């Protein structure tokens, strides 16, 4: 009888230890997950680079119907929100019906050929913003620098390659300066 009671105590003690271990492990896992999610240093370099230079703040007053669409498009394609909001402000001043003298269309001022390549309708505000964010991200992937991505968005990637940097065109230099802030 004494050995049965002793076996039951050992069994309860083992269960308690196992439960304690599981609880402590769960708490540590939750803390580590939170710490990792909030630590820029622990993020992969490709993710850290997304935010380089993005001490940029969108200071425009527009908060209308396209604002959230633009923020969502930026997030969806890994573009810093403030950078994309500043781009849209510069490109069209939030005018969905804008058409430039060169033929660029909509909020993100997509050229018809670029819109076709991206498979978006440039006259649809949501598709236009999605295409603009996707195209800016593609330029970032190509040049690995947000300022060069902006220059490529404005002057074309070939011009950035040809000049091995921001092309010496006053329009493009001013474009990058206005959006980037320097």
Feature-to-residue mapping (PLM):
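Cell-wall glycan-active module
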Residues: 1-86, 181-182
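Short, functionally critical alpha-helical segments immediately adjacent to catalytic or ligand/cofactor-binding
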Residues: 68-71, 78-95, 129-134, 149-156, ...
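Phosphate-coordinating loops and pocket residues in cytosolic domains that bind phosphorylated ligands
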Residues: 89, 112, 162
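Acidic helix/loop microenvironments that form the catalytic cleft of cell-wall polysaccharide enzymes
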Residues: 92, 135, 145-170, 175
């Amino acid at each position: 009888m004494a050995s049965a009671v002793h076996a039951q105590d050992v069994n309860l003690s083992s269960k308690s230890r196992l439960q304690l271990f599981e609880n402590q492990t769960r708490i540590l896992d939750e803390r580590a997950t939170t710490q990792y999610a909030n630590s820029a240093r622990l993020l992969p370099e490709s993710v850290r680079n997304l935010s380089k230079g993005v001490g940029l703040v969108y200071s425009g007053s527009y908060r209308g119907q396209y604002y959230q669409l633009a923020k969502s498009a930026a997030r969806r394609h890994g573009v810093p929100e403030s950078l994309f909001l500043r781009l849209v402000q510069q490109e069209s001043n939030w005018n969905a019906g804008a058409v430039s003298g060169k033929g660029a269309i909509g909020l993100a001022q997509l050229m018809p050929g670029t819109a076709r390549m991206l498979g978006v309708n440039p006259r649809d505000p949501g598709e236009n913003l999605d295409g603009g964010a996707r195209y800016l991200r593609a330029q970032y992937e190509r040049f690995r620098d947000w300022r060069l991505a902006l220059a490529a968005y404005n002057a074309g990637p070939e011009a950035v390659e040809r000049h091995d940097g921001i092309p010496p065109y006053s329009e493009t230099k001013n474009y990058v300066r206005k959006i980037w802030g320097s």
